[in-house]
């Protein structure tokens, strides 16, 4: 008899296959009783169109898998998707180049059931495993599937696809009575994913649709072995004092008795602070036959669980990331039967509504971490297009995020493997987790079985997230939950002891229990830089505040649309024909945007038409791919910088402060031209460096709404002796104005507006520069250069309100930049051995100097690290070091000025070559220097 996985305190063990409560097993990998199937032998994968035998036959030990695809577990411990299996076995080399994916597999153009024949049928996943020792209980743990699955063990069906469905719903089956000595076999028949009818996942409009709809297994399939007592589901419920002076920790662990007789054991808990003395407590627990008991350790019963002066976990810009270790064990007769181990952090999160205001009558969402108000500054996460998880790739992207200065990553659905959260904990990056929009997660009614999957998913997700200090909130997406969904989810989260905070929507919606979300969304396509400073335009008839994207409140997803990578990156994924279309045909559908065709109004993002139209009108027409890419870099830079700076600048507004911006999206799971701050090869283009500049820890902002200067301190300590100098130049390099603030002192997270008001030109059609120089105790710590026109961008608000892109009355006239004279640039570079992010072991230091004899600006100067020769010549082909991670770039210098940039990289990336730095710019010819 199959028992529901939702809401049970115990279930019969040892009576044959059945579905057991999620509490029977840790969601983490830190249990000695749990192992990942396929870790040793891998998996065999094949379409049912070829493997036509029955599940009973395929799951029989000794079944021949000759000709099947061989697939190891990925870095998250799972066999992955069907397309991933094909790629690993040689199908479609260079799948992301141009339209290779479409050529190899076909293309879907609508989210829904798979329309590609080879993926519209079930596929088999098969692996062998060894029997546990005699007398040991064995449970099969399926941690969700993308699609639905029939499960077979040793010739017997354990579960049907009616039970095993849901990307995050955990199912546990007792298979003790099915196993034989020696080799045993598991076969899983994966039925095609349909995100419009299943509680799974999809890619919305973020990219091309994966040809297999991501059908497969993205989380580990596990075997839990133990007897007679098994400990699991261990976690900490913390109550931390408001002033952070103490933290009372309640520890809970479930102990399961797998035998037919009552059992007594000693349950021990050890909490170890970083570098500190372990705290160990224990108690005896008697568990009835074939049942599970929650053993609780409270601070009142065990006073040592109240920690005085705890080590507090902070976001990386504010402090350290100490992680405590929680270890539990169950023993009988002095012998430990099994144990668990995982980490947790001590910190507080405060979520509130600030306001109200005319635009936001219920207030706007705001967050404090450890009582410190912070402006959330982040981006949306997109996993690999085929859900291939690689811990090294996560580490590389963390390096990119921290170098960029963002503090948050948002998960809209696509919840991640355990390693991902562990890395975010260690890195100090905040995680805004939640459900996905626009699919079955937002359906308004479910069957009884679907209700069960929804609640089981929430419980499993809660178990995964609850101990991770990086996860500071969980929210629904576009739509607020129905009353039924809200109850199911909150019941599931409560069963997991996951405290949230929970937000009812990513838009300005509300739900019966959680109330007002206080968030908004959009825009998603090109808007001018000064759009981000708007605080007064919104659609009064749209209560969700969609596309009211100015810098007020909390915007859960927004950006200026398409981003153009560097030429190095473009050459890795666009064919010559693709490249020609990129710079010659703005209305062309770009395969590496998404599947939406050639529309460019409303919610259609398949072309770069709106971006290109703005570039043409603002900077002038281009005559080559390289010129187009350069102009796009400049425009992307100024737009992303403005988005993040505006939200910091307006965080001081009292009525409706800017409290957070999530760039849509931070990354992509494939090479892209749409919504990304860095490409999947680590490419750092103009969009990246614009955000990086905006998020410098001590930074000056030229506010585009009132032409004054703001200074902010986004670091964790007070900065005193700070001055801000504002210099205004014309395009000939003449200084038109030069003002310096008085000495300033800024506490952590302090934002000071109007510290300087530079005098800028007013004559018509005049292009000018503003250079901001921040010094502390006389030392330069921040440079920020703007280019602007007295012919400004003017948004047609009556036509723009409610739209995902701006309709323009007038574009800024920056075409005079085309006439800048050539500048003379020199550079020096040195390399030292130094550890860096993601395995980097070298640091290159580059000093770029403008040596022009006349006052000619060196505009938008970029340095790149390349493979070359000892004489300073670049090697041919793709010579960029993709592991390089830059501290700053795309800088602008006047004669006599220098800027020192640094980059970390992996020496192995040189492949025996000499490191060479190239420097080029808008009006500077390319030079190369050896980084000796």
Describe every region a protein language model picked out.
Residues 280-310, 733-764, 878-908:
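Intrinsically disordered, low-complexity Pro/Gly/Ser/Thr-rich segments with frequent PxxP/GP/PP motifs
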Residues 307-340, 758-811, 904-932:
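Terminal connector regions
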Residues 35-51, 145, 213-216, 542-720, ...:
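Substrate-binding clefts and catalytic carboxylate motifs of secreted carbohydrate-active enzymes
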